[in-house]
Design a protein with these regions (language model features):
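N-terminal Lys/Arg-rich, disordered targeting/topogenic segments
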Residues: 1-13
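Alpha-helical transmembrane segments
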Residues: 11-28
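Solvent-exposed, non-transmembrane regions of membrane-associated and secreted proteins
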Residues: 27-245
């Protein structure tokens, strides 16, 4: 009887250790995954902070210039395109994290997880739908970016759901690598089906007076496969000179 009791105790002890080891393994794996994700985010942030330092040309402003009239500095596209000829522009939204080069790949997967430096990054790049023209002259131009949890890329577009945020950040600027710039006014935001009208491209137009629309597209916060979160904008102003002139 005593022997059976010892065997039973030993089995329970072994089972406990197995459970402890399994829980420890799960914890260590979870810790590894968390650290890997955090490192990826930190690395991506550094990539685009370096891009701002390297390719944005600071512009001295008139002291009397109103904050609401501020416009983005010029971009050294010659140096930027020496790194990657797929760079076709730069997107900027005053007072937000959106301040990135725009890429145009052979398809819509090429720059999902590749930076403008052609290196892997969890944040990927901001990129134009491959069916759209690099001159942004289509009836609708779609630009994609990841919905990053740290707010990078298009990670804060959902804030346009709030009226006060829209009022504070009403314009999207596109600086073109071939010269000139475009200023878009934000119309609104919402969800769009991936097989819906928004992504029915290309939509070229020969009507010079027709509205040119810009759609910024990212994943929804719940990562649904059938819809995307979009911010729709309309072209309001076009410039042929650098924005610092």
């Amino acid at each position: 009887m005593e022997i059976k009791k010892k065997q039973s105790t030993r089995k329970r002890s072994t089972a406990r250790w197995i459970v402890v080891l399994l829980l420890l393994a799960v914890f260590l794996f979870s810790l590894y995954q968390t650290l890997r994700i955090l490192y990826g985010y930190r690395q991506a942030k550094a990539v685009y902070e370096n891009a701002e330092r390297a390719y944005l040309i600071p512009v001295s402003r008139d002291e009397t210039e109103a904050e609401t009239e501020r416009i983005p500095p010029a971009i050294d596209f010659e140096a930027l395109r020496a790194v990657n000829k797929d760079v076709i522009g730069w997107i900027f939204i005053e007072g937000t994290e959106v301040n990135y080069p725009i890429l145009l790949g052979a398809n819509n997967q090429q720059y999902l997880f590749q930076s403008y430096e052609k290196k892997y990054t969890v944040a990927g790049s901001i990129f134009l739908d491959y069916r759209c023209g690099a001159d942004f002259e289509d009836a609708r131009t779609v630009v994609y970016g990841h919905n990053m949890k740290n707010g990078m890329m298009f990670g804060k577009l959902d804030r346009y759901q709030k009226a006060d945020y829209l009022a504070e950040h009403p314009y999207v600027y596109i600086l073109l690598a071939e010269g000139g710039w475009k200023k878009y006014r934000v119309l609104g935001c919402g969800q769009a089906a991936i097989d819906g009208e928004t992504y029915d491209l290309p939509r070229s137009t020969e009507d010079a007076d027709a509205d040119r629309l810009l759609t910024l597209s990212t994943c929804t916060n719940d990562s649904r496969d059938d819809v995307r979160f979009v911010v729709n904008c309309v072209l309001e102003e076009v410039g042929t000179q650098n924005l610092d002139h």
